[in-house]
Amino acid sequence: AVPVSLEDSHPTPSLPVRPPVLCAGCPHRSSFYAVKRAMEKLNQELPDGQEPVEGVYCGDIGCYTLGNAKPLDMVDTCLCMGAGITMAQGMQRVEPHKRYFSFVGDSTFFASGLTGIVNAVYNEANLTLCILDNSTTAMTGHQPHPGTGRTMMGQVVEKVDITKVLEGIGVKHIRTVDALDLEQCVETVLEFSALEGVKAVIFKAPCIAIVKTTKKCRIVEDRCVDCRT
């Protein structure tokens, strides 16, 4: 036998790097893609010779910060909670020919988004609010917030309605869409982003980490190969 030292053996390769991503089945994936697809469709349908319309996508703090990763690549800015709304206002004043989208989750909407929206309406900013409503505070552990209908002690109470809050602030154009209905989302984004002023699209679908699937598996016995999977 030939003695072999540990130094002569092949080193164990490092594990491949896997960047953080949105969960498989996360409705935020669909919401981001709908806005991306809407802007692509807008530019595809422009008359020949017309300059393409550039979209600016202002992100925020939450799971949806991961919208910055490819292939979505839909977060141009991320500073702090609520900043996606206020940063879009400032940039829109300097480059008004672009279309501005401010992404904010339902939890961040209540925690830090309201003051920025009030300011946007009052100062007649031109931007599209994309409220990603998954009915929880997903990133930090699924804590309740005023839109969930449950207090921090677990008591069931009446939800604070996001649409009514927006109406009270003065947002004129508000629509709730199924975040997983791509066609509906794309058409709504195209329609709303062309309007003047502050407008809001509420992309609603539950967080995949808390929803229980209604699909049931069954065995087709005459095709079963006993694979145990």
Please place each PLM-identified region on the residue numbering:
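An N-terminal assembly and electron-transfer interface module characteristic of large anaerobic redox
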Residues: 1-2, 125
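Ferredoxin-like iron-sulfur electron-transfer modules
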Residues: 9-25, 176-194, 207-229
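Generic structural signal for bulky hydrophobic/aromatic residues embedded
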Residues: 29, 35-38, 93, 123, ...
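A generic structural signal for short, non-catalytic loop/turn and secondary-structure boundary residues
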Residues: 50-52, 56, 170, 194-196, ...
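Thiamine diphosphate
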Residues: 66-200
